[in-house]
Amino acid sequence: MLKTDLTAPDCLQEGEMGKKLQAKCLGIISAASCVKLYCCYGVIMVLTVAVVALSVTLSVRKKKPVMESCEPCYAVCSSGWIGFGNKCFYFSEDMGNWTFSQSSCIALDAHLALFDSLEELNFLKRYKGASDHWIGLHRESSEHPWIWTDNTEYNNLVLTRGGGECAYLSNRGIYNSSGDIHKKWICNKPNNYTLQRPLIVNPG
């Protein structure tokens, strides 16, 4: 009985210490849990923002037309024709007078070639080879202005040499002579495709 009375305070003391230790442990665990919880909230917020931003980006890209590059932006021409700028050119292997050459071009839904710039003229000179070629420049007489086969007046971008009524392209420039002489010829027609400019594709 005496032994029991002596140990009772010790037991009470040990019980109080256990409660304090338990509370301390719970506090440590609670603090660690809060840190982990905040970390989880932070990760969730970052992921949510990333998903929203990605969704907005994809939505904008879907609505925006896609521009397909066209480099170089030369005309797309049928077989046997050469594209430059927005035109297609045909360089004949046969020979004929100026009138026959123009008729041959018309049969191909084209006309004897005309040029709008020095770049176009230089392209024709490079590509034609060594032979002279009829082009679409002509006049009624030496008293009349030069006109193209589409009836537009020539702007004298390059002077013609000679005393004839029909012009041809040589390695040295533009010359003219009687239209009865047989030469090769160059036809041209506008490009009928849309690929000479960037193609807009609307996503479905």
UniProtKB/Swiss-Prot annotation:
Residues 1-36 are cytoplasmic. Keywords: Cell membrane, Disulfide bond, Glycoprotein, Lectin, Membrane, Receptor, Signal-anchor, Transmembrane, Transmembrane helix. One of its GO terms (cellular component) is plasma membrane. The keyword Transmembrane helix applies. Residues 84-188 form the C-type lectin domain. Its main location: membrane. Disulfide bonds join C77-C88, C105-C187. Pfam families: Lectin_C. The chain crosses the membrane at residues 37-59. Glycans are attached at N97. It is found in: Cell membrane. Residues 60-204 are extracellular. SUPFAM superfamilies: C-type lectin-like (SSF56436). SMART domains: CLECT (SM00034). It is a single-pass type II membrane protein. It comes from the Eukaryota. One of its GO terms (molecular function) is carbohydrate binding. InterPro entries: C-type_lectin-like, C-type_lectin-like/link_sf, C-type_lectin/matrix_domain, CTDL_fold, NKR-like_CTLD. Lectin-type cell surface receptor. PANTHER family: C-TYPE LECTIN DOMAIN FAMILY 2 MEMBER D (PTHR45710:SF35), C-TYPE LECTIN DOMAIN-CONTAINING PROTEIN 180 (PTHR45710). This is C-type lectin domain family 2 member E. It comes from Mus musculus.
